[in-house]
Amino acid sequence: MLLNNGELDGVRILSPNSIDMMRLDQVGNTPPTARLTNIMLNDGIGFGLGFGTIKNQGLSGLALPTGSYFWGGAAGTFFWVDPRNELIGIFMTQLVPHRTTLRQDMWGLTYQAITDNRVNP
């Protein structure tokens, strides 16, 4: 549904405008003291309505292309949506503590596996 601009199996769930608003950075530039972690809300990552948004891949420090959005949950679970490459990823694990490189590794391996001309970094 998120990848298809609010439509799932031919049924409109959310308007395209709602999806655009969800993906749009709602926070803007934040001073370093207001940032949640050293990764979240840096100059390349914003926060939309429900997930982190990649505003600039080069500044984000993440392997996700500009325009992608993502979020994680407890024990290392996470998902991401990459509209440019028409790709979604869902990673389910139960790893405590989850401060590992699994997310970066998964993103890197995914994009490395699809190295043909379809991938637009």
Predicted region positions:
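Catalytic loop of the DD-peptidase/beta-lactamase superfamily, centered on the K-T-G motif
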Residues: 1-121
